[in-house]
Amino acid sequence: ANYSNAHGTPWVYKHQQIGRLVGMPVPGTMTTVSWETLQDPTLIFGTPITGYRLSDGSYLENTQLEPDVKVANSPETVVKGEDTQLRTAVQELLKEIDKK
């Protein structure tokens, strides 16, 4: 599952044009959450307290981040210890090197 900085970190990476994103879309979940424990310490809940805005005033919350190269890891390959997303990311980097 992707949440919060699993959205914020790749968003900054793409927004700053540091490189290309490889993987699957990330739901827009970029807020700061305050975690509270109730009287029963097994009950914990999070309350969003800060939303992150772009220069145009729109919020990152509910704004899905799309990768440049969309590729999923299937359960069948994951149980074999294979990472299709990582392999694709390395292939994309090698293409960039070959261009130079």
Region roles according to the model:
Residues 1-100:
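C-terminal "post-core" interaction segments
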